[in-house]
Structure formats: structure tokens, C-alpha cells
């Protein structure tokens, strides 16, 4: 008895797990989301740290800024003091001129008649100072001449110590000492002549003072208050003038320090700019040899992080493994697969079951699966 022919066994069975959308294992999906969030947080923290490091000032900048502030404060203070000193000098000069003019009006012509005497006294005082300086130079020249002669004597003793042999070292020393003696002798003669000259001038100036003092004694006594006041005022003016000159030099030095600090700051700024430029160039590294950038990444853009790519590959492999495990119960599956996921042949499931001698015909079925590389 023949059995009824059943329907065709060519039935496409759905791949287990294909009906579900989303990740096959929820744990892997959650792990992927957590890892992605962790990567983003780490990237954001790294960017924040990098910006914080870049924003951190170079300690040299703080030092130079402190020096700049100190120099600026010093310049302001010195300029104020300089203005005050100049104002005081002008005030004293005006007051001195007013007082001297008033006193000259009271004394009359005796001031002009006694002026040669005070001028001779001034020249005599300068001659005395020149004489003192010339005397010091002459004494120093005499000492140098005596030391040079002593050196010549020592060198001569060394040369004549060994009569059988002439030592070139002692000979050179003797020549050098002889030159020093000649130079010292010339300096001594020149200093002696200068000292005699200024001494003679000093004597002449003192003699002239004595002569004028005798001839202009009455006018000298009458005009003495004027010239004494003038001498006092000149001393005060010289002190203020020296203070003004000193403050001007201090201001100039402070401005030099200020400009030097500005140059240092400019140099530090250039170094920081060059270092940041070099860091930005080093951060844009090329991919390793053999690695291919994803097609979606354009030139000048950065692709996804390496950890994200590894996580996506892990999810794909896990999905394929689950698909392979879910069809282990299927029998007689073909082992020939293609890269695009299509089977090269159909599987016939004509396994017949014989019950009580009857011959049953089973239907063939196919199963499609894909292999991910």
C-alpha cells in the first residue's frame, strides 16, 4: 500500500535568533554601551587634562611678570622723586638769584671791584688740588721705578749665578725688568715735571691772592656778605644737581631692566608657541603600517577609537557564534558556504521512515547562514 505523497520538503527555515532585532545577548549590548560611555568619558577627561595642562602658566612667566611689576613701580617712584628734585633745584636756583640780586643792589660797585680777588682765590684753590694730585702721581712713579730696579737686580743675580751656562729664562726676565725700569723712569720724569709745573702755578696763584688782598682790602671787606652767600648757595645747588643726576641714572637703569624683562617675556612666549605647535603636530599621528582607515573617515578627520572598533567586532563574532550554535540540531547541512551568505546547494531531507513496511517520503529543506569575516 502506497502512502500519500506529502508536500515538498523544500522549506526555508528561519535562522534562529534572526527574528529578534538588536543584540543577540543583552549582556553584550549593555557591555557595549557601557564601554562606549567609558571611552567617551575617558576621552573627555583626557581632553580636559590636556586643556588644563596647556592653560597652566610657565613659572618663568610669573617670575618675569613680578620683575616687570617691580621695575614699573620703581620707575614710577624714581620719576616722582626726579620731578621733585628738579622742582626743588629750580626753586632754589630762582631763590638764590633773587637773593643775590637784592644783595648786589644794596652793596653796589664794590662787588665788581672785589671780584678779581675771589676769582684769584678760586684759581689758587684749584691749583692746590692739582698740585696734590701731581704729587701722588710722582710718588707712585718713584715706587714703580724702585720696584723695577729691584727686579733688574734679582734678574742679574740669576743670570750671573751660573757662569758656565746662560739660562734663557733669567735672560728673558732681565730683559723684561730692564724695559720696566725704562718705562718707570720715563713716568717718574714726566710726573716730576708735571708736579713742578702745577706747584709753580699754585705759588703764582697764592702770590696773586696776597697782592689783591692788600690792594682791594676795603672792597673785599664790604662785599664779603655777597660772596659768602654766593658760595653757600652754590654748594646747595651742587648738592641738588648731584641728586638730580643720580636720579636720572637710576631711572635709566630701571627702564633698561623693564625693557629687558619685556624681551624675556617675548622670548618665553615664542618658546611656548613653538612648543604648542610641535605638540599639535605630534598629536596628529598617521595610522600604523598595514592598518587601513575606515572608508567613512575623510581626510583630516579622526575615525572611531580603537576600543570602539574592537567592541563592534566582538559583538559580530558573538552573534555568529550564537547562530552557529543554534543550528547544531540540523542534520546534513552543507559545508560549502559563500562569503555573501548564500548556500551553493540545496539540502534534500528525503530521509524516509518505514513504519510497518510502509515507505514514507520526507520533504527536503534548506538552511541559509552567513559567515562574517
From Swiss-Prot:
One of its GO terms (molecular function) is guanyl-nucleotide exchange factor activity. The keyword RNA-binding does not apply. It comes from the Eukaryota. This is SH3 domain-binding protein 5-like. Residues 344-358 have a biased composition (Basic and acidic residues). The gene is sh3bp5l. InterPro entries: SH3BP5. GO terms for biological process: intracellular signal transduction.
Amino acid at each position: 500500500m502506497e502512502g500519500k505523497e506529502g508536500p515538498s520538503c523544500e522549506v526555508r527555515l528561519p535562522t534562529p535568533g534572526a527574528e529578534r532585532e538588536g543584540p543577540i545577548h543583552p549582556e553584550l549590548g549593555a557591555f557595549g554601551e557601557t564601554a562606549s560611555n567609558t571611552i567617551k568619558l575617558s576621552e573627555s577627561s583626557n581632553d580636559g587634562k590636556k586643556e588644563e595642562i596647556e592653560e597652566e602658566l610657565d613659572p618663568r612667566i610669573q617670575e618675569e611678570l613680578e620683575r616687570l611689576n617691580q621695575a614699573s613701580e620703581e620707575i614710577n617712584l624714581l620719576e616722582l622723586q626726579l620731578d621733585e628734585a628738579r622742582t626743588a633745584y629750580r626753586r632754589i636756583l630762582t631763590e638764590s638769584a633773587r637773593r643775590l640780586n637784592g644783595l648786589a643792589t644794596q652793596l653796589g660797585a664794590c662787588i665788581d671791584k672785589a671780584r678779581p680777588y675771589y676769582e684769584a682765590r678760586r684759581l689758587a684753590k684749584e691749583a692746590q688740588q692739582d698740585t696734590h694730585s701731581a704729587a701722588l702721581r710722582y710718588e707712585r712713579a718713584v715706587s714703580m721705578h724702585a720696584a723695577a730696579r729691584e727686579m733688574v737686580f734679582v734678574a742679574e743675580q740669576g743670570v750671573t749665578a751660573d757662569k758656565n751656562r746662560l739660562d734663557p729664562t733669567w735672560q728673558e726676565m732681565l730683559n723684561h725688568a730692564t724695559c720696566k725700569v725704562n718705562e718707570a723712569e720715563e713716568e717718574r720724569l714726566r710726573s716730576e715735571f708735571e708736579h713742578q709745573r702745577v706747584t709753580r702755578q699754585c705759588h703764582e696763584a697764592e702770590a696773586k691772592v696776597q697782592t689783591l688782598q692788600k690792594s682791594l682790602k676795603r672792597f673785599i671787606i664790604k662785599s664779603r656778605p655777597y660772596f659768602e652767600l654766593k658760595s653757600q648757595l652754590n654748594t646747595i645747588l651742587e648738592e641738588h644737581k648731584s641728586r638730580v643726576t643720580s636720579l636720572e641714572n637710576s631711572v635709566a637703569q630701571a627702564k633698561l631692566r623693564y625693557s629687558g624683562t619685556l624681551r624675556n617675556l617675548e622670548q618665553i612666549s615664542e618658546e611656548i608657541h613653538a612648543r604648542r605647535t610641535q605638540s599639535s603636530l605630534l598629536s596628529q599621528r598617521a595610522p600604523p603600517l598595514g592598518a587601513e582607515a575606515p572608508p567613512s573617515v575623510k581626510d583630516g578627520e579622526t575615525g572611531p577609537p580603537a576600543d570602539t572598533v574592537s567592541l563592534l567586532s566582538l559583538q559580530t563574532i558573538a552573534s555568529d557564534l550564537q547562530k552557529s550554535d543554534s543550528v547544531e540540531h540540523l542534520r546534513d547541512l552543507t559545508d560549502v558556504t559563500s562569503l555573501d551568505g548564500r548556500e551553493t546547494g540545496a539540502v534534500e531531507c528525503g530521509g524516509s521512515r518505514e513504519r510497518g513496511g510502509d515507505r514514507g517520503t520526507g520533504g527536503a529543506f534548506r538552511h541559509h547562514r552567513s559567515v562574517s569575516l
